[in-house]
Amino acid sequence: MTALKENNVIIGIDPGIRNTGWGIISNFENKLQHIDHGVIVPETEDSDASRLFFISSHLDEILNNYKPSLAVIEKIFVSASGESALKLGMARGVALNVIASKKNIRIVELAARFVKKAITGSGAADKNQIKFMIEKLLGKRVSKLDASDALAIAIAGSNSKNKKLNPYNVITKSQKKNVNNNLINAINRALNKS
């Protein structure tokens, strides 16, 4: 692996109380490079508080190890289940708290549909389609869907890494329309490899 400049390291986070996916990439001179990925999986029999502590401590360790300058996290999608949305919100809040406690990490929040569209060209893509594209883009096998989602979040967020963003920035409609041509070209190159 080539030496990475610290300011090119990006973490994507797909929060969840059962599984929190994370993916680390760099985007140097518009070249995506896979660094690492994984899924934080608390014990199923643990209380919500214990699960949240487990997520917090493991995410803190990951951030300390890779020292990203940009953290990209998925926004909450409100589903029919209020309890699911609440638990997702708790996991997301813990992740944001850990990230916010670090110096020099900017935070970008992206909607799931935006990430799907940026990676696959369709805002309605399923997890397997995202996984397929991530493996093509990064040239790396990713066995867990939560990890491939997190890598997708990181890649979509890397599109805005050189723009001046405020912490907790929400991508606007005009930014959604202006998807980085380099990312589209990388997707097309990856599709041509298969």
Each model region followed by its residue ranges:
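Phosphate- and other anionic-substrate recognition elements at nucleic-acid/protein interfaces
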Residues: 1-194
